[in-house]
């Protein structure tokens, strides 16, 4: 398994950026040692890019389920977008193919990121909800309708406590928090959900977590396992 140090990632990104090869960075990682260690490395990478290398390009970073809330919060003040992979459309599918993971553990950082976005937007005098494209605003009964109302207190949404939010310096907390919103991705075809289940999950994510995008990734068989669909 290949790994890069935060300094190596920063060097690559800044060199590519100077040559106009890239406009931004998508930073993701498998779990290295444990979620806390992995998230710490990702935070250090973003902190170096923004502060030492003065990188002002777009950054999308994955949040690692199980990582400390403080690390996810600090990372959110350095990233443009964050995402947490839902992995599979239903909890039953996740339990079948990845029993070491739980949907609750995946949704926890997703809710925390949503709370931080709401807190920042309300402080900045904006609507709690992310803006949608103009076409979506005029569609009746769209997938974005009947979203749960969010109060002015991000702590009311749960998962992230007001004490952890106050742990950051005032200057850092006043910065934009994940201004481009959060997204997720789920694998389609590895489990037997029907279209109604897939769209219901997407609707729930848009309405209850105010995601900017739900992405779908087609299942591609790599390993042989009786729990996985046949290659035929």
Task: State where each predicted segment sits.
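Conserved Radical SAM active-site core
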Residues: 1-181, 188-191, 205-206, 220-230
